[in-house]
C-alpha cells in the first residue's frame, strides 16, 4: 500500500503537493482528481477552510473535519501598513501563538520576509524577537501561509521570499526545506528568489547543503550568514551564541558550503553606530572576505526600546560601504523599510504581546 502523505503536526493540508493531495484523496477512498481540486483551492483560490471547498462532497468534508484534518491557514490578528507601503502582519496559530511576517513592495518586486520559529533562542542583542526566547518551531503550513497571506492582503504576487523573520531557520531545517519545496512547486517562486538566513549553528552548513540537495535536487537558494562583526570578541558582544562558534570556524564552514553547492554566500552586517561601523571594522571585514565567493549586505540598525544601540548616520554607512568597495568586496546597502511602523524584526509582535499582558 502506498504510504499516506505526512501531514504537519497540526493535521494541515497546506504544504502538501498536488501529488501528495492526490494520494491523500485515494487513501480516503476518493478519486485522485479530488486531491487536485483541493490543491487548486488551497494554493490558487486561497481557501481557508475545508467547508469553503464547495466542489468536494459535503459528506467527505464533514468526515475530514471530524478527523481533525484542516487546511491550516493562520488567523489575522493585526496588520500595519507603513508610509512606504511596507506591510506587517501578525497572525495567530492554532495553539494561540503569534507569527509575524512582512511584505516589502517595490515597483518590480514583492519580497515576503517570513518567520521560521515563534520567538528565537539565539538572543542577538539588537533583535526584538530574541528578547522573549523561543516558544517553538513553525510547521510547514505556518511558514507557507505567511506568503499566501501577504499575497492576499496586498493583492499582488510575491516574487521573493527571505527567511529573515523570527527564529533561526537552521534550527528548523527540515520544515524550512519542505516549505521551500512548496513555495517553488506549488506557489511558483523560483529557488533563486529565496534566501535562507542563519546566525550560524555549529556543524549545520554542510548538513544544509546535503539535505537541500536531497530534498530539492539542486541548491539554488541563497544562504545569508548574519555576521554583524569582523572579529570574535565583538561578535560575541552582539551575538552571545557566537561564543560556541568561533568566527574562523564559521567562515571555514561557509567555504565548505560554497564548495558543496557552487553558490556564493551572502554576509549580513548590521551597522550599529559607534560599535561596529568604524573604518577599522571595515578593514577587518574586507580581510575576512578576501578570496571569498561572497557578497556583503550592510543594514543600518533599526532601534528597539530595550537596547541603547544607535543607528549610524547615512554618511557613516556610505563611508563603510566605500571602504569595502575600495578593497574589492562586493557590497550593497539594504534600504530600511517600514521604520515608522516598527518593522524591525519582532517589534510589532513583542508590543502586541506586552499589551495583552497589560490588559
UniProtKB/Swiss-Prot annotation:
Residues engaged in binding S-adenosyl-L-methionine: 167-168, 197, 226-228, 302
Cofactors that this protein relies on: [4Fe-4S] cluster
Keyword Transferase: yes
Catalysed transformations (reactions): adenosine(2503) in 23S rRNA + 2 reduced [2Fe-2S]-[ferredoxin] + 2 S-adenosyl-L-methionine = 2-methyladenosine(2503) in 23S rRNA + 5'-deoxyadenosine + L-methionine + 2 oxidized [2Fe-2S]-[ferredoxin] + S-adenosyl-L-homocysteine; adenosine(37) in tRNA + 2 reduced [2Fe-2S]-[ferredoxin] + 2 S-adenosyl-L-methionine = 2-methyladenosine(37) in tRNA + 5'-deoxyadenosine + L-methionine + 2 oxidized [2Fe-2S]-[ferredoxin] + S-adenosyl-L-homocysteine
Annotated compartments: Cytoplasm
EC number in record: 2.1.1.192
UniProt keyword Hydrolase, yes or no: no
Superkingdom of this protein's organism: Bacteria
Main location: cytoplasm
Pfam family of the protein (one): RlmN_N
Cofactor: binding details: Binds 1 [4Fe-4S] cluster. The cluster is coordinated with 3 cysteines and an exchangeable S-adenosyl-L-methionine.
PROSITE patterns for this protein: RADICAL_SAM
One Gene Ontology term from the biological process aspect of the record: tRNA methylation
SUPFAM superfamilies for this protein: Radical SAM enzymes
Domain Radical SAM core: 106-340
Record-annotated disulphide pairs: 113-345
GO CC, one annotated term: cytoplasm
Any GO molecular function: rRNA (adenine(2503)-C2-)-methyltransferase activity
Record key words, sorted: 4Fe-4S, Cytoplasm, Disulfide bond, Iron, Iron-sulfur, Metal-binding, Methyltransferase, rRNA processing, S-adenosyl-L-methionine, Transferase, tRNA processing
Binding of [4Fe-4S] cluster, residues: 120, 124, 127
InterPro entries cross-referenced by the UniProt entry: Aldolase_TIM (IPR013785), Methyltransferase_A (IPR040072), RlmN_N (IPR048641), RNA_MTrfase_RlmN (IPR027492), rRNA_lsu_MTrfase_RlmN/Cfr (IPR004383), rSAM (IPR007197)
Active site (catalytic residues): 100 (proton acceptor), 345 (s-methylcysteine intermediate)
Note in the entry: Reaction proceeds by a ping-pong mechanism involving intermediate methylation of a conserved cysteine residue.
Summary of the function given for this chain in its UniProt record: Specifically methylates position 2 of adenine 2503 in 23S rRNA and position 2 of adenine 37 in tRNAs.
Record-stated family: Belongs to the radical SAM superfamily. RlmN family.
Protein name per the record: Probable dual-specificity RNA methyltransferase RlmN
Organism expressing this protein natively: Prochlorococcus marinus (strain NATL1A)
Gene name of this polypeptide: rlmN
